[in-house]
Swiss-Prot record:
Family in the record: Belongs to the calycin superfamily. Fatty-acid binding protein (FABP) family.
UniProt-listed Pfam families: Lipocalin
Superkingdom of source: Eukaryota
Protein name: Fatty acid-binding protein 9
Tissue: Testis.
GO cellular component, one term: nucleus
Gene Ontology MF terms in the entry: long-chain fatty acid binding
Ranges annotated as spanning the membrane: none
Cell membrane among keywords: no
PANTHER family from the UniProt entry: FATTY ACID BINDING PROTEIN
Length: 132
């Protein structure tokens, strides 16, 4: 179930991302920069822990976690969140919670691409990545 996600991915398309990061509460200038960045994402698994590294010219982030166990994360926009990542129906589901708020990041593989659907309240952004 995890294997299709493993590897390095590059962003090839992004829909409604500015509205999503606005809904997260990201201020105007960093929001504009975030929309211009085309990050790469590397996902690995060592049998016990999963690692997700996201990198761009502006910022690199890395999380290391056990599936199904909550962990603390500092996001690319510097939010301090509690995250929980699980697998459901072939999708990797990440829920981030902070200050009474919640966002869901759903990753799935569609036709060899990784499709990432980010939802905050009623705002949805879809970002598509191709394997490098």
């Amino acid at each position: 179930m995890i294997e299709p996600f493993l590897g390095t991915w590059k962003l090839v398309s992004s829909e409604n991302f500015e509205n999503y990061v606005r809904e997260l509460g990201v201020e105007c200038e960093p929001r504009k920069v975030a929309c211009l960045i085309k990050p790469s994402v590397s996902i690995s698994f060592n049998g016990e822990r999963m690692d997700i590294q996201a990198g761009s010219a502006c910022r690199n982030t890395e999380i290391s976690f056990k599936l199904g166990e909550e962990f603390e994360e500092t996001t690319a926009d510097n939010r301090k969140v509690k995250s929980l990542i699980t697998f459901e129906g072939g999708s990797m589901i990440q829920i981030q919670r902070w200050l009474g708020k919640q966002t869901t990041i759903k990753r799935r593989i569609v036709d060899g691409r990784m499709v990432v659907e980010c939802t905050m309240n009623n705002v949805v952004s879809t970002r598509t990545y191709e394997r490098v």
